[in-house]
Amino acid sequence: MQLNVNGAQAIEVSDATFGGEFNETLVHQAVVAYMAGGRQGTKGQKSRSDVSGGGKRPWRQKGTGRARAGTTRGPIWRGGGVTFAASTRNHDQKLNKKMYRAALRSILAELVRTDRLVVVEDFAVEAPKTKALLSKLNGLGLNDVLIVSDAVDQNLYLAARNLPHVDVRDVQGSDPVSLIAYEKVLVTVSAVKKFEELLG
């Protein structure tokens, strides 16, 4: 299949990478797994068994007229433990490399199908100036955009850092969440070749 390049001749790309079917279930699984992997999960509360003290029963079993109590660290006591105490846990979800790559191929194919993928010959700014980057993006009619190049350009990264709706990634730093989060994805021809190399 062919991909149109902005201001240049169309390029031939692999059907397997850019022309496949959209697998919503797989993409959803990849997004959930990616976001779960970013969770810290270091919460912690103490249950009745974790709270210090409470070994001695507060009063005898019978004869006081009060409800029986074996410890002062039960959940209904002040200073007691939490009923269903949260504990530190690992939220990671396993996703096979083959499935992850298939999800990325599916996303790229959908971006092409919905005209959200903009391909350019090259994209760079001479200095790390936000104004210069905005001018280039406005020239292409782009506002909410992810810029993907084959390698991170420091000037481009610094110029985009202060723009809330613009992000810069290299091909290997692209993930399912960032690829679907923006209105448009701007890729260079070299990045397209790199995607084919990694996902083909």
UniProtKB/Swiss-Prot annotation:
Protein family (similarity comment): Belongs to the universal ribosomal protein uL4 family.
Q: What is this protein called?
A: Large ribosomal subunit protein uL4
Q: Which organism is this entry from?
A: Ectopseudomonas mendocina (strain ymp)
Q: How the protein assembles, per its UniProt entry?
A: Part of the 50S ribosomal subunit.
The lineage's top-level taxon is Bacteria
* Alphabetized PANTHER family for the sequence: 50S RIBOSOMAL PROTEIN L4, LARGE RIBOSOMAL SUBUNIT PROTEIN UL4M
Q: Does rRNA-binding appear among the keywords?
A: yes
Name the keywords, alphabetized. Ribonucleoprotein, Ribosomal protein, RNA-binding, rRNA-binding
One GO BP on record is: translation
Ranges for the region named Disordered are: 38-73
Gene Ontology cellular component list: ribonucleoprotein complex; ribosome
Give the protein's biological function. One of the primary rRNA binding proteins, this protein initially binds near the 5'-end of the 23S rRNA. It is important during the early stages of 50S assembly. It makes multiple contacts with different domains of the 23S rRNA in the assembled 50S subunit and ribosome. Forms part of the polypeptide exit tunnel.
From the record, give the transmembrane residue ranges: none
Instruction: Name the gene.
Output: rplD
Against Pfam families, the record matches this protein to: Ribosomal_L4
InterPro entries the record matches: Ribosomal_uL4, Ribosomal_uL4-like, Ribosomal_uL4_dom_sf
Does RNA-binding count among this protein's keywords? yes
- What are the GO MF terms of this UniProt record? rRNA binding; structural constituent of ribosome
